Amino acid sequence: MELNYYEILEISQTSDKETIKKAYRKMALKYHPDRNQGDKEAEEKFKLVNEAYEVLSNDEKRSIYDRYGKEGLKGQAGGFGGFGDVDLGDIFSSFFGDGFGFGSSTRKKEKGNKYPQDLKITTKISFKEAVFGCKKKIDFSYKSFCKSCKGSGSENGKLDTCPHCGGKGQVGVRQGFMTFVQSCDHCKGSGQIIKDKCKTCHGNGYEEIKDHIELDIPEGIDSGMSLRVQNKANELPNSSQRGDLYIKIIVEDDDKFIRHDDDIYTIVPVFFTQAALGKTIKVSTIRGEADLKLPVGAKDKQKFELTNEGVKNIHNGKLGSHIVQIEIKFPKNLTDEQKNLLLQLEKSFGLADEEAFIEQESLFDKIKSWFSH
């Protein structure tokens, strides 16, 4: 069932103008296309929210709608709801201003700049480079505005008003009895076009320049972290210096070590006699070999912590831990002599077959007793 305008804005039919404005603001923000890119359902709801506000914010149209519904509005000047002369971007801007970052506001802010001033790149480093830090050469390219056309892309340095949108950067598209606003395809939302392209930059407004830096990567950096280098990114016509370069770090995996935050994890094979006797074993850490004293009768998959053998925290300098999980190994093949030795060991513990059976039977009786009450 189709919702009425009051239901779309989630207000009652007796709501005053201030309530309608607040409801519109809330719903427009919620369903704005810039916040829900690629979401067709949100896009349709945003159109309905604007449609509802256009009617309910106008006393005359609201009165007609309350009496006759949508049918009563069809005969109004400018088509249904009078949207023929209304710019939804202007409605939105009247609430949120030109600095809010949505719709036509964004277009005005970016007008004249063909690219952002800051630059983001990604670089890979090895596991050990991340753990201990390193100095690394980073190659990249940045954009520098064309000096011939001052970044405009036009031969004479001037841009012409787009004839399709009249310089607004957006056009109205009619769908049935409604008109909605979308970015102008002809000028890509800029409101301006280039008639004669600059021969130096071929209309791009910039040139790509290769550059490199020697980057000091700090000890303990982790995958996903970014480093900023000032004044090494793109150059804009109206700026005295270049933007900031942001370098996202991707750390490659290691064959032996697994890292989680500042801790290192490894699985260490331990022979069953070492676990039974509580031997001291050697463990390879990121900082060299360390001794690990096993308790007598250590269990398979038991974990042990070697403090201060992990990664240095990039913020406070504290060292993490090295977590060792042991994996008890048994021999696959035994000689006759080894079998006899194990049998002798078994007998030395007094593990006769009859005693083992009695112990199992006793356990079985205990379990049965749980269900007898």
UniProtKB/Swiss-Prot annotation:
Main localization category: cytoplasm
Cofactor binding, per record: Binds 2 Zn(2+) ions per monomer.
A molecular function (GO) term: ATP binding
InterPro entries: DnaJ, DnaJ_C, DnaJ_domain, DnaJ_domain_CS, HSP40/DnaJ_pept-bd, HSP_DnaJ_Cys-rich_dom, HSP_DnaJ_Cys-rich_dom_sf, J_dom_sf
One annotated GO biological process: chaperone cofactor-dependent protein refolding
Localisation: Cytoplasm
Domain of life: Bacteria
Keywords for this protein: Chaperone, Cytoplasm, DNA replication, Metal-binding, Repeat, Stress response, Zinc, Zinc-finger
UniProt keyword Chaperone present: yes
Alphabetized SMART domains for the sequence: DnaJ (SM00271)
GO cellular component: cytoplasm
Cofactor dependence: Zn(2+)
Mapped zinc finger ranges (CR-type): 133-210
Binding-site list for Zn(2+) 2: 162, 165, 184, 187
Domain J: 4-69
Alphabetized Pfam families for the sequence: DnaJ, DnaJ_C, DnaJ_CXXCXGXG
CXXCXGXG motif repeats by residue range: 146-153, 162-169, 184-191, 198-205
Residues the record lists as binding Zn(2+) 1: 146, 149, 198, 201
NCBIfam families membership: DnaJ_bact, PRK10767.1
Assigned protein family: Belongs to the DnaJ family.
Function: Participates actively in the response to hyperosmotic and heat shock by preventing the aggregation of stress-denatured proteins and by disaggregating proteins, also in an autonomous, DnaK-independent fashion. Unfolded proteins bind initially to DnaJ; upon interaction with the DnaJ-bound protein, DnaK hydrolyzes its bound ATP, resulting in the formation of a stable complex. GrpE releases ADP from DnaK; ATP binding to DnaK triggers the release of the substrate protein, thus completing the reaction cycle.
Subunit and partners: Homodimer.
Domain remarks: The J domain is necessary and sufficient to stimulate DnaK ATPase activity. Zinc center 1 plays an important role in the autonomous, DnaK-independent chaperone activity of DnaJ. Zinc center 2 is essential for interaction with DnaK and for DnaJ activity.
Protein known as: Chaperone protein DnaJ
Species in which this protein is naturally found: Campylobacter lari (strain RM2100 / D67 / ATCC BAA-1060)
Gene designation per UniProt: dnaJ
